[in-house]
Structure formats: structure tokens, C-alpha cells
Swiss-Prot record:
Documented EC number(s): 6.1.1.20
Cofactors required: Mg(2+)
Record text on cofactor binding: Binds 2 magnesium ions per tetramer.
MF terms (GO), sorted A to Z: ATP binding; magnesium ion binding; phenylalanine-tRNA ligase activity; tRNA binding
Residues annotated as binding Mg(2+): E274
The reaction(s) this protein catalyses: tRNA(Phe) + L-phenylalanine + ATP = L-phenylalanyl-tRNA(Phe) + AMP + diphosphate + H(+)
Protein name: Phenylalanine--tRNA ligase alpha subunit
NCBIfam families membership: pheS
Length: 347
């Protein structure tokens, strides 16, 4: 190839590249044109560069100089086209935009107050050596009632006070549970079912808490809801007394509600504890009931295979919502389950 032919090819390549870059309507088209002319492997400039070897030796300096000049010109044309597509120097800038102002921080999620309370309770009880135990929310009557010393005729087993599940079917496809009868399963009405399952599997000493949902068909109002959370505590060992129970609850109350909180026991009755007490905390000058407690009834120990002559223990149950509401000054339990972000964002 002669020098004139080589120079003519370079001039034509530069002209074609200028036209392609100028006519590119968007970044994708401009990039396609760049690859066509400046591509490292198959670009047209690369192809012409390979022809330099066929130029006479005496003409190679002039051909090389022209090649470099055209390459620089094509690169400059590409950069100009790129700048034009992006709006130039300042022509596309919004005059009202101030880059020195801080950006808008995206909204962050909030942990639900019940979840916060459960985490706090778990931390407090964990410092006293209590481990978390879990159990199913769908239970059978033995774990929910029988093993807890609740007899068959006890009003707590009434279908009007529990969510029995009509899951058993007869061959005709109808439910085998008649109106007014207990079903083979129910939504647990208390987290005490977990202590039965743990004691059936583990030998003393035991020190556990169970936090979870329980279900009772209560009409929703400011203090009642069909589903709520309980914290059940269980300690089984030798020589456990009411003094141990009161100490644990006092330490818990001081950690959760403050050092100035006092505690008192009022005599009560629960089938699964004997003696049984209601637990009140003196908080902000008012005695407030938070739950029930007591020494585990020997019949409960017998149901799980423990010898009540060798071991003793206590159990307590506290309402998580009640603790949460008192701590945060919430007056209506329904607010916790309303899904109203205006309320939940406060926590």
C-alpha cells in the first residue's frame, strides 16, 4: 500500500468517526460507535494500524505521525460527543440544586414495642441464669390442662373460654367435635404448657422462662385482647422456697421498672401452684397487679414423673403487654396491634 492510499484511508476513517459520534442520540449508540472505530480488537483504527507494515520504510515515519494524529482526533471527537450527551459543562445543571445541603435520610424501621419488651425481659432473666424455652402454640388438653392439675370439670376448660380446634374428622367428613365439647387440640391458653414439656424431657435442676403468644376468647377492649403474650418462669431444684420466688421477682422488677419498685404477694388460687399468690408491684405510688405465681403443686410434679418429696420449685406468669404498657404509659392494648405507624414510630 502506498503512502497516499494509507493517508486517504485515515482521512476517511476520521470523517466517518466524527459523523458517527455526532449522530449518536444516546450513550448506548455512542458506545457502539466507539467500539466500531476505537475498539481494541476489532476497531477500524486497529485494522488500519495493521496496514502500517505494508508501507515503504522511507514513508513509515510520515504514516506513523498521521496515524497518531488521527487517533488523537478520533478520541477527542468521542470525548466531545460524550460531554454533549451529558449536558455539557453546566448547561444541564438545576440552578435550584445546592450540592452542599445534607441529603434526605431514608426512614428507618422501628422494632415493635412488644418485641423490644420481650428482648429486655429475656436479657434481665438471662442475667439470673434463666434460659429461654419454647413450645407449640397449638396444644393438646393434657399439656394445657391435665398435667397442670386442672380437672375436667374446671371452668377454665370451658369451650367458651378457649379456642378449641375442630381438626378431627369422622369418615363422613364432618367434625368429630360437637358444640360444647373439648376438641383434640386447642390454641394454648397459657405458656405453662412449656414448663410441662421441659420437665418431661429434663431432670432438675431447671431454670427456664418461656415467652410467647397465648389465646383466650376475650372481647377486645382497652385491657383485653384475644391474643397476648406471657412470660412464664420456672425454677425446680431442691429446697426451693417462697423466699426464692420473691427474690427473683424483686430483682426482675428492680431491673425492669426501677430500683424504687416494691413487691407484694396476695393470697390467690391456681390449680398448678400451692400456695398461690397474685404479684403486685408498687410503681409510681400505685400497687399494680402484674401476674400470678406460687410453689409448684405436687400433682404437677407427679404428672411429669418428678418426686415431690425430693424436689420443689416455683412458677410465675407475667403479662408482657401489661409490662410494656406500664413502662411506656400506653393506655389501650389495642394500640399495640393497630399497625398505626403514627403510634409505633414513637418507640
Amino acid at each position: 500500500m502506498s503512502l497516499d492510499q494509507f493517508l486517504t484511508r485515515l482521512d476517511q476513517l476520521q470523517s466517518d468517526a466524527d459523523s458517527a459520534f455526532t449522530s449518536a442520540s444516546d450513550a448506548a449508540a455512542l458506545e457502539e460507535a466507539r467500539v466500531t472505530f476505537l475498539g481494541a480488537k476489532k476497531g477500524q483504527l486497529k485494522d488500519i494500524q495493521k496496514m502500517l507494515g505494508g508501507i515503504e520504510k522511507a514513508d513509515k515515519p510520515a504514516a506513523g505521525a498521521k496515524l497518531n494524529a488521527v487517533k488523537s482526533a478520533i478520541n477527542a471527537a468521542f470525548e466531545d460527543a460524550q460531554q454533549n450527551l451529558s449536558g455539557g459543562d453546566d448547561s444541564g445543571a438545576d440552578p435550584t440544586f445546592d450540592p452542599t445541603l445534607p441529603g434526605t435520610r431514608p426512614s428507618l424501621g422501628h422494632i415493635h414495642p412488644i418485641t423490644q419488651t420481650i428482648s429486655h425481659l429475656t436479657e434481665i432473666m438471662g442475667r439470673m441464669g434463666f434460659e429461654v424455652a419454647e413450645g407449640p402454640e397449638v396444644e393438646d388438653p393434657w399439656h394445657n390442662f391435665v398435667a397442670l392439675n386442672i380437672p375436667e370439670d374446671h371452668p377454665a376448660r370451658d369451650p367458651l373460654d378457649n379456642f378449641y380446634l375442630a381438626t378431627a374428622k369422622d369418615p363422613s367428613g364432618k367434625s368429630s367435635v360437637s358444640a360444647g365439647d373439648e376438641g383434640s387440640q386447642l390454641l394454648r391458653s397459657q405458656t405453662s404448657t412449656v414448663q410441662i414439656r421441659v420437665m418431661k424431657q429434663v431432670e432438675p435442676p431447671i431454670r427456664i422462662i418461656s415467652l410467647g403468644r397465648v389465646y383466650r376468647p376475650d372481647a377486645p377492649d382497652a385491657t383485653h385482647f384475644p391474643m397476648f403474650h406471657q412470660m412464664e418462669g420456672l425454677l425446680v431444684d431442691t429446697n426451693v422456697t417462697m423466699a426464692n420466688l420473691k427474690t427473683v421477682l424483686r430483682v426482675f422488677a428492680n431491673n425492669y421498672l426501677g430500683e424504687d419498685v416494691e413487691i407484694r404477694f396476695r393470697p390467690s388460687f391456681f390449680p398448678f401452684t400451692e400456695p398461690s399468690v397474685e404479684v403486685d408491684f408498687l410503681w409510681n405510688g400505685t400497687w399494680i397487679e402484674f401476674g400470678g405465681a406460687g410453689m409448684i403443686d405436687p400433682n404437677v410434679f407427679a404428672a411429669v414423673g418428678y418426686d415431690p418429696e425430693k424436689v420443689s420449685g416455683f412458677a410465675f406468669g407475667l403479662g408482657v403487654e401489661r409490662l410494656c404498657m406500664r413502662r411506656h404509659g400506653i393506655t389501650d392494648i389495642r394500640d399495640l396491634y393497630s399497625g398505626d405507624l403514627r403510634f409505633l414510630k414513637q418507640f
